[in-house]
């Protein structure tokens, strides 16, 4: 087992986490697909898939936070009104998938792996929960508003914010000040050098779980590419933008647990755009933490 470094152990927890995750953070953000998102190339189908994964992830995270809200290893970071995203994501699921969204949203293998780890941490290693909360919530606060504006413009969504509740934190007036408060609370957590080391390692794991989501979509993209004949690929390249960014009328069948790779419903370009948005969600957000 890797022994904790003395210099990192003398740091505040917030600084130790930022330092420890630099390398894996670079892995998450250095992708050619980031350029697609920065250009506003976000499809509705791709966005729906990302939001469904986030719903499952935050549901698991917040179930474990509730379980450990009075545990001193997490209690100082309990900000349900300000931070919790499940209720907002339920609104978004209803917008994107309709009234029967609970039966319609996909639940991919990589998402299931992420959820499993969150439950393991909350159930048997609650002192590590801070790593996942830090990675997700501070990233959302840092990059969420930028991502919201890009997605809103790219998909011509209502200015009132329907479908984008996840990115809105109505109980936080000043994100910068709140992040300062959150870091200060993190630094009050009492932990041994060994526990601090495990927390920083778990933060790396959180990044790797997000990267696994990216790789899952990349695999789907590769499979989709192999299934495309030259004529089909050329047709996709020539499709007007209005057809690429279609409406949400083609819903996922109820009870479906895996993403369909049918070329008629999820063309090659959509997987590219989906992957770019996933990368941006983590990389742009956490970059500014």
Curated annotation (Swiss-Prot):
Subcellular location as annotated: Endoplasmic reticulum membrane
Q: Which residues lie on this side of the membrane: Cytoplasmic?
A: 1-266
Q: What induces it?
A: Induced by its substrate heme and CoCl2.
GO terms under cellular component: caveola; cytosol; endoplasmic reticulum; endoplasmic reticulum membrane; nucleus; perinuclear region of cytoplasm
Question: What biological-process GO terms show up in the record?
Answer: angiogenesis; cellular response to arsenic-containing substance; cellular response to cadmium ion; cellular response to cisplatin; cellular response to heat; cellular response to nutrient; epithelial cell apoptotic process; erythrocyte homeostasis
What Pfam families does this protein map onto? Answer: Heme_oxygenase
Q: Which residues carry this modification: Phosphoserine?
A: 229, 242
Regions that span the bilayer: 267-289
Q: Which EC number(s) are documented for this chain?
A: 1.14.14.18
Task: Report a single Gene Ontology molecular function.
Answer: phospholipase D activity
How this chain sits in the membrane, per its record, is:
Single-pass type IV membrane protein
Instruction: Specify whether rRNA processing is a keyword of the entry.
Output: no
User: Which reaction is the catalytic activity of this chain?
Assistant: heme b + 3 reduced [NADPH--hemoprotein reductase] + 3 O2 = biliverdin IXalpha + CO + Fe(2+) + 3 oxidized [NADPH--hemoprotein reductase] + 3 H2O + H(+)
Annotated residues that bind heme b are located at: 18, 25, 134, 183
Spans annotated as Disordered: 225-261
Query: Has keyword Endoplasmic reticulum?
Result: yes
How the protein assembles, per its UniProt entry?
A: Homodimer and higher order homooligomer. Oligomerization is crucial for its stability and function in the endoplasmic reticulum. Interacts with FLVCR2; this interaction is potentiated in the presence of heme.
Q: Which PANTHER family match?
A: HEME OXYGENASE, HEME OXYGENASE 1
User: What is said about the domains?
Assistant: The transmembrane domain is necessary for its oligomerization.
Q: Which family does it belong to?
A: Belongs to the heme oxygenase family.
Q: What is the name of this protein?
A: Heme oxygenase 1
């Amino acid at each position: 087992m890797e022994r904790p470094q003395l210099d990192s152990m003398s740091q505040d927890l917030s600084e130790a986490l930022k330092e420890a995750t630099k390398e894996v953070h670079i892995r998450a953000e250095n992708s050619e697909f980031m350029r697609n998102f920065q250009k506003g190339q976000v499809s509705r189908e791709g966005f729906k898939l990302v939001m469904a994964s986030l719903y499952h992830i935050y549901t698991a995270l917040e179930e474990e936070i509730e379980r450990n809200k009075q545990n001193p290893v997490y209690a100082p970071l309990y900000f349900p009104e300000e931070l919790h995203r499940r209720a907002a994501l339920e609104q978004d699921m209803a917008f994107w998938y309709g009234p029967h969204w609970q039966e319609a949203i996909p639940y991919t293998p990589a998402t299931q792996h992420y959820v499993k780890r969150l439950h393991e941490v909350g159930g048997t290693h609650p002192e590590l929960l801070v790593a996942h909360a830090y990675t997700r919530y501070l990233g959302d606060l840092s990059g969420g508003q930028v991502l919201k504006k890009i997605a809103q413009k790219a998909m011509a969504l209502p200015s009132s914010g329907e479908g984008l509740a996840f990115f809105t934190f109505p109980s936080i007036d000043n994100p910068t000040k709140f992040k300062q408060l959150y870091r200060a609370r993190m630094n009050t957590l009492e932990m041994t050098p060994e526990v601090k080391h495990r927390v920083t390692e778990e933060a790396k794991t959180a990044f790797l779980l997000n990267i696994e989501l990216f790789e899952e979509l990349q695999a789907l993209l590769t499979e989709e590419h192999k299934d495309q004949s030259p004529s089909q690929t050329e047709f996709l390249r020539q499709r007007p933008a209005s057809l690429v960014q279609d409406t949400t009328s083609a819903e996922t069948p109820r009870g479906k647990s895996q993403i369909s790779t049918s070329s008629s419903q999820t063309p090659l370009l959509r997987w590219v755009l989906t992957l770019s948005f996933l990368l941006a969600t983590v990389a742009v957000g956490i970059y500014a933490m």
